[in-house]
């Protein structure tokens, strides 16, 4: 964290004198913390800083599809929270072919097992290849949404200012993207359990921010 903060701070210091209408797409981990570092260093508006966090949602969709034995293209789902261990899968918002479905406890546990163990299982294959292309595809979608001013909604880490009840912290949420960056932050209704998990994610991110500010 400290090393990445120092690198990002050095880069951002060179942006201060440039036109302030640009949008920054951040893929440096821990992305939620680094988003705030970027804003502190550049002074840009929060809607001009977009953190890459889409892979958590992709893994959730893939896991749901595997557990239900269907194609992943039929699944609509999303993760909120930290881009990392404290990601919050919204089981209350799982859709198959645009129809809401409820997973039972066994299915939820199986989905969580898939999402939490995918990396270790991939490493065990020793394929000599990378799964990093998925990040490239998702980053391209963010760029395309900005370049075309499409208004597409994508999962991103966004600095909040009252949304979901939080301020001055960057968290993964669905955001509408356009030419100026983030045009709208979508606030989803959460279950009590999901809200509690999101609170835990925010607490962890705040703690990491505090550790590099002391």
Residue ranges and their predicted role:
Residues 41-50, 56-214:
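C-terminal substrate-binding/catalytic lobe of Rossmann-fold NAD(P)-dependent dehydrogenases
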Residues 1-61:
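Rossmann-like NAD(P)(H) cofactor-binding subdomain of soluble oxidoreductases
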């Amino acid at each position: 964290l400290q090393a990445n903060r120092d690198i990002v701070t050095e880069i951002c210091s060179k942006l201060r004198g440039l036109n302030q209408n640009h949008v920054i797409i951040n893929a440096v981990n821990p992305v939620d913390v680094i988003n705030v570092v970027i804003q502190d260093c550049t002074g840009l508006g929060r809607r001009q800083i977009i953190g890459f966090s889409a892979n958590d949602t992709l893994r959730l969709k893939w896991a749901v599809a595997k557990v239900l034995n269907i194609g992943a293209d039929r699944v609509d789902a999303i993760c909120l929270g930290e881009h990392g261990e404290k990601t919050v899968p919204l089981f209350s918002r799982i859709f198959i072919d645009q129809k809401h479905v409820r997973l039972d406890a066994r299915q939820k546990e199986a989905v969580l097992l898939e999402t939490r163990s995918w990396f270790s299982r991939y490493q065990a294959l020793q394929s000599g290849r990378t799964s990093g292309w998925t990040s490239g595809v998702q980053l391209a979608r963010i760029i395309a949404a900005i370049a075309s001013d499409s208004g597409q909604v994508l999962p991103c880490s966004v600095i909040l200012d009252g949304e979901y009840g939080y301020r001055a912290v960057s968290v993964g949420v669905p955001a509408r993207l356009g030419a100026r960056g983030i045009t709208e932050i979508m606030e989803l209704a959460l279950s009590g359990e999901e809200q509690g998990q999101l609170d835990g994610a925010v607490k962890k991110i705040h703690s990491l921010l505090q550790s590099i500010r002391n």
